[in-house]
């Protein structure tokens, strides 16, 4: 009788093995810089005098929108006793459109950019001892071809002297194309075209030691930045040829007695 009662409480639970994913992301931005009665010689350059507002008045309108479609296939973590991690493979197509005043100030000039990227993600979130999340994405076709993003983080947790110790690490490496408005901009008083900018290289390595009971934390990180793109004081685009290093250190200790 007891065996029959136990069997009656058993139930089958469906655990999905694979997910097919599609995401659509749309963004639209519009910016207007409007000014009247600009002081004489206030701006160094004037590229057109006509437009919506002529003379010394300014009406610079910039538009930008992008449409991004991502398709992914995911093998879910835990669907099989031998599958200790989840795996996702994805591909993305992005369309970007930009619109700014043309050289007459009356019409408008537009630019279109397409990009195709592929990537993968490996992650483990279940369990209490080990977790990790690794992701890689590279751009194959388009304006940003050659871009690369590598991200990784992991943590190990274990008990020590009535406390829980966590050792965590995080790192990333990015090779990124400077964004559109570093490369092109058109307005009544500011205008530039920079098609030969180098890709920025960003590297980050971080280690974290923490104790749960005493809320003690020590974090050390190193950042390296190469080919940094920036504006000079006169709005000329520059690319730094030197490496920039940052080493932040955080020590956080809160100790209290448990009665």
Predicted ranges, named:
Residues 3-259:
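Exposed, low-structure sequence patches enriched in small/polar residues
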């Amino acid at each position: 009788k007891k065996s029959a009662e136990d069997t009656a409480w058993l139930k089958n639970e469906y655990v999905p093995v694979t997910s097919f994913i599609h995401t659509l992301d749309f963004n639209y931005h519009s910016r207007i810089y409007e000014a009247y009665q600009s002081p004489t010689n206030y701006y160094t350059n004037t590229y057109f005098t006509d437009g919506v507002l002529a003379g010394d008045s300014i009406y610079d309108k910039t538009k930008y929108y992008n449409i991004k479609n991502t398709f992914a296939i995911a093998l879910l973590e835990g669907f099989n006793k031998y599958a200790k991690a989840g795996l996702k493979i994805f591909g993305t197509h992005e369309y970007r459109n930009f619109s700014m005043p043309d050289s007459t100030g009356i019409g408008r000039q537009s630019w279109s950019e397409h990009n195709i990227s592929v990537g993968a993600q490996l992650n483990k979130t279940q369990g209490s001892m080990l977790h990790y999340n690794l992701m890689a994405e590279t751009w194959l076709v388009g304006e940003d071809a050659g871009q690369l993003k590598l991200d990784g983080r992991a943590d190990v947790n274990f008990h020590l002297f009535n406390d829980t110790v966590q050792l965590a690490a995080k790192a990333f490496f990015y090779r990124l194309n400077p964004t559109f408005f570093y490369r092109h901009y058109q307005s009544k008083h500011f205008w530039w075209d920079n098609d030969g900018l180098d890709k920025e290289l960003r590297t980050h390595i971080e280690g974290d030691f923490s104790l749960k009971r005493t809320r003690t934390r020590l974090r050390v990180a190193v950042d390296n930045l190469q080919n940094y793109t920036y504006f000079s004081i006169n709005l000329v685009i520059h690319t730094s040829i030197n490496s920039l290093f940052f080493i932040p250190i955080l020590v956080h200790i809160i100790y209290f007695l448990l009665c």
